[in-house]
C-alpha cells in the first residue's frame, strides 16, 4: 500500500515486452525482464503478451504474461524487502553467479544440503581468490554495511522481520524470496 509506480518500462510495445541484446542472455537480464513484466501487468491491470528477450546466437528468454493480481502481490513483496533494506543492509546481490544456479533450477530451497552447496558456491564469487582478485566483498560499501561480518553467516533470527525463519541463512532465504518466483515462471510452474 502507498506505493506509486511512475516512469516507463523499456521495450514495452503496448502489448508485450520485446528486447534484443548483443550479448548472451544472462540470468540477471532474466530477473530484470521478470520485474519489467510485473510492472507492466500491475500498471495496466491486464495480462500482457509474452516478454521476449533474444540474445546473441539466438538464445532467448520467453516469459509468459503474468496475471495482474500476481504481479501486484510479487511487487508488494519486493517493495517490502526494499523497505526492510532501508533499515538494515540485506545480504543479497543480483550477480549472475548468484542467479544462474536458481534460474537453472539447480537449487532446491527445501533441501538443506542443496542450499548449503549453493551458499558455498556463491561465497566463492563474493570473496577474492588468486584467479578472481576483485570481488563484491571488497567493495567499501559492502565492508561498511556489514562491519566486516560475512554476509553468508547472518541468520534470519538476527532481524525481527525474518525471525520466524529461525536459524536459516538470511542470504539463502532472500535468494529464494527474490529469485524463486522467476525460476518458477521460467520452468512453467507459475
Model-assigned labels for residue ranges:
Residues 1-190:
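Structural signature of nuclease core domains in nucleic-acid processing machines
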